[in-house]
Amino acid sequence: MDKLLRVENLNKDKILHKVSFEMEQGEMLAIMGPSGSGKSTLLYNVSGMDQPTGGKVWLGDTEITGLSEDAKADLRLHRMGFIFQQMNMIANLNILDNILLPVMQANKGKGGKSKSELIAEAKRRMRQLSISELGSRQITQVSGGQLQRACICRSIMNEPEILFADEPPGALNKSAAGEVVAELLKLNQEGMSILIVTHDSKVASTCDRIIYLLDGDIRGELGLGKLENSMEKQREERVNRWLMDMGW
């Protein structure tokens, strides 16, 4: 498999210390660790939303850390998708307009798809995520799980090479969280590469591989391979045993 993401000796002030790892095309990789271990900081620095104080990051053949801020913003808009626990929806826009916002910006002045084509694409993806009836609603008129599925829809509208997810089901109840994880797993099974920060062993057990971060250092790694439904319980038990060995 091709290396999609390469991180080499990444430093960030006193938070990250020469962090190095690689991610393959089509992989679902979890970053775990206790609060304050540097998980979210790692995600922000790898994706170019923050500038590390040392080290390099590549997405494919593009060195992200060597780009200007404008070039990094353009790369995030066209080649990355993002899902955050806080969801980052615009309060005065309805669900459909929120979903369309980034991809409309990405298509502006580039001779890409028309607005009607993008709306049709958004509605198709909304049907896939079981939120087709929510397009005209305001963000205050839907449940947390529905809103997070709308965030997933928004994040994949530009057909990104990689999806970054920072505790996506963290603020949801158990049922809604399970639905969100199932949607992410479905995307991965369709070929989407996903880097997910999580403190939840059940979420991590659906991933192909887990990296354990402590005090800004990678302290361990667990390879699980692709999930088979019949092995779900055994995988979670294996992850929990490994986390105990890591000092979780």
Language-model-detected regions and their locations in the chain:
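Catalytic Walker B motif of ABC-type/P-loop ATPase nucleotide-binding domains
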Residues: 163-166
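Conserved ABC ATPase signature
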Residues: 138-142, 146
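Helix-to-loop junction immediately C-terminal to a conserved catalytic motif
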Residues: 47
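The feature captures the beta-strand-to-loop junction immediately N-terminal to the Walker
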Residues: 32-34
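Conserved ABC ATPase "signature" region
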Residues: 63, 107, 113-134
